[in-house]
Amino acid sequence: MAMATRVLAQSTPPSLACYQRNVPSRGSGRSRRSVKMMCSQLQVSGLRMQGFMGLRGNNALDTLGKSRQDFHSKVRQAMNVPKGKASRFTVKAMFERFTEKAIKVIMLAQEEARRLGHNFVGTEQILLGLIGEGTGIAAKVLKSMGINLKDARVEVEKIIGRGSGFVAVEIPFTPRAKRVLELSLEEARQLGHNYIGSEHLLLGLLREGEGVAARVLENLGADPSNIRTQVIRMVGENNEVTANVGGGSSSNKMPTLEEYGTNLTKLAEEGKLDPVVGRQPQIERVVQILGRRTKNNPCLIGEPGVGKTAIAEGLAQRIASGDVPETIEGKKVITLDMGLLVAGTKYRGEFEERLKKLMEEIRQSDEIILFIDEVHTLIGAGAAEGAIDAANILKPALARGELQCIGATTLDEYRKHIEKDPALERRFQPVKVPEPTVDETIQILKGLRERYEIHHKLRYTDESLVAAAQLSYQYISDRFLPDKAIDLIDEAGSRVRLRHAQVPEEARELEKELRQITKEKNEAVRGQDFEKAGTLRDREIELRAEVSAIQAKGKEMSKAESETGEEGPMVTESDIQHIVSSWTGIPVEKVSTDESDRLLKMEETLHKRIIGQDEAVKAISRAIRRARVGLKNPNRPIASFIFSGPTGVGKSELAKALAAYYFGSEEAMIRLDMSEFMERHTVSKLIGSPPGYVGYTEGGQLTEAVRRRPYTVVLFDEIEKAHPDVFNMMLQILEDGRLTDSKGRTVDFKNTLLIMTSNVGSSVIEKGGRRIGFDLDYDEKDSSYNRIKSLVTEELKQYFRPEFLNRLDEMIVFRQLTKLEVKEIADILLKEVFERLKKKEIELQVTERFKERVVDEGYNPSYGARPLRRAIMRLLEDSMAEKMLAREIKEGDSVIVDVDAEGNVTVLNGGSGTPTTSLEEQEDSLPVA
């Protein structure tokens, strides 16, 4: 591109890009004319051209490397232009006025010259460049006349032939081509344009009329006068479209406002705005403020999604229908696009000029109400070094009442930006827009129903609208009504529509076969196997007919449904529930038969993994069933328990088993080891670090986990190890199901199951709760458990505050494990070892004697099942590891583990007559500890 610029500069005619002066010739009285071309004399060290684009408002030589001086000053220095009148002459005409498309035309013309082997660029190459550019007005007009690049190239070669000489790197322009460039500038001036586009080059080419290009057009049957007419007509249409950006009228009274704004009142008259339901107090307050003499600028403040923009649209609809006071009757509500206003302002003062023009048009019109959505974007908009931003430019007009402006912004942005500038804040009158209630949201949805039914081509039931409002309020906590409810019905409509629009499975299979047949047919034709191609073509025709018949049948069925009164697909309550579930992961759909069976058999399933502890398993199962059928308190967590008891009896394991069974996997559980929160300063890790501290941007371990997965089990393991401040923070979680994190966001805990484990009271349980005297309770086991429970509860009251314990749903005391229960757990743990060895293709069997030995060594009522795991590790896993390393046991072996008469563990490779306990005889269950 650098080379193209240099050639263009050298070839530019004198009237365009050079300075001429008469210099007296030595030895004579006559003067001779000296012509200094722009780039031929421009040899400035350090001046390196890097780009050739963006000419409409920028220099053609986009980036001048290694030079800080202005490009035009370099040109003047190279041309030795004296000060005075001539020094004001610049070379803007060519380089600053060429559009990108015009530059592309010149570059393509040079490429065409190289292709033809010519060492010049003439009018014919410019014509080929105009056709080859493809997207400009000139290319479109020539294409509409039936002129294409291929035919034009043929005609050019016929007339001038191909060159055989050496083509220089820098290809000069012919005098006639220079004349075309000169005429294109004149054409641009006549049309009132301050740029040269491809259309002006074409007009210059036609006006020149005597070059090879004119003969080419004549040979191709094109009428120059007709081409000229078409170009001027298209230029006029483009100008009209540009003037009407933003939907304004074609009358050019307010060009700036129409370019950067959208007329909401006109859209309301055309019925293109959604109906606004309710919000009467806010609209009346806005009208009231607009009627003031000064500072008549309402600012709508509310949370995102509550309907601030809708209030401006509601005002436009009222004005369109005439239902407004005479103070604002006949006015236009125009929303300003700040992004469009700032876009393309490359030079200092350009943005301010646009804004001043805009304000002047509003001031002169006196019938404009300006609506600026996200009004906080005014602050800092357009500000550069030494410039002032949009807010400061607008301040005087806002205060004097010359400009009626409605702003809209969120509470956070209002606090961050507008409240920081008291001078701007006093010019806007705040109008609070509260979140609508569920009932108001239902009315809004009913008002919008028709628009969404037309868009999705279906119907919404009343129940679906009620469900959208209620479920979005209950389950989607981080957004606001009515926005989240509207999004629900919109996505549900899209889902139902797509489901009904699916092609039948039969038609899909036929289409797949049809594609394959077509592919094979084309390959057969390429391979000149015409007999096979003919057979495949017949099959292709048959398949097309079958597909058409299936599609026609589907259309007839839908037509018959509509005739019988069925108005297309319906969006029901279950569709809304499905969308809520897919958004949040919370199952809100109705309980299916399979799920009902799972819920009713929950205790039985959990007991496959948890041995004993009936009270805890029943309490957990009851809570899940209550939540799933929708009977739980909607403002509290699903349930909150504290599991207390000795170590190793299955407190944490029960939470893991629940997460694995009901929530899909153990990873679905949020586990917090409270031993990590023993110090006061670690409490902030739960909700996030305060501002100014490391980790503020990362969020809290608890709050972020629940925000991402709102339907889950939260396990606070070893709760008594935590600092007492943790319990204070948990009070609002247990009571109201909510917690505010360090960034001020409210996290919803209403769909979590909270489980806290504790070893408080383990010393009481170890003693067994025995007391002196007679016990009249016949069930000694239950009597002992009840005594232990009351003693543990008393000890919990000593450790935890009453307000904490009072908020828990249930305090469950785990029993000590009996020897029989430990034996069942041993079966589960041994099965784990069998499974691990099976992956290594080693079959393991243990005898009954070995199992008894493991239970004897691993049973300790005070420590639960954990000693059992250690006994298996020591007696079984260590023995197996030694034998495997000694290569006495290899893959594919069958191993029996037994205990001899002296009590030593023996590992036998191969079968023996000893009675064994095989893998198949083990219970199908999983470990407890």
Curated annotation (Swiss-Prot):
Highly expressed in rosette leaves. Expressed in roots, stems and inflorescences. Expressed in photosynthetic green tissues with high levels in young, developing leaf tissues. GO terms for molecular function: ATP binding; ATP hydrolysis activity; ATP-dependent peptidase activity; mRNA binding. Transmembrane segments: none annotated. One of its GO terms (biological process) is protein targeting to chloroplast. ATP binds at residues 302-309, 645-652. It is found in: Plastid, Chloroplast stroma; Plastid, Chloroplast membrane. This is Chaperone protein ClpC1, chloroplastic. It comes from Arabidopsis thaliana.
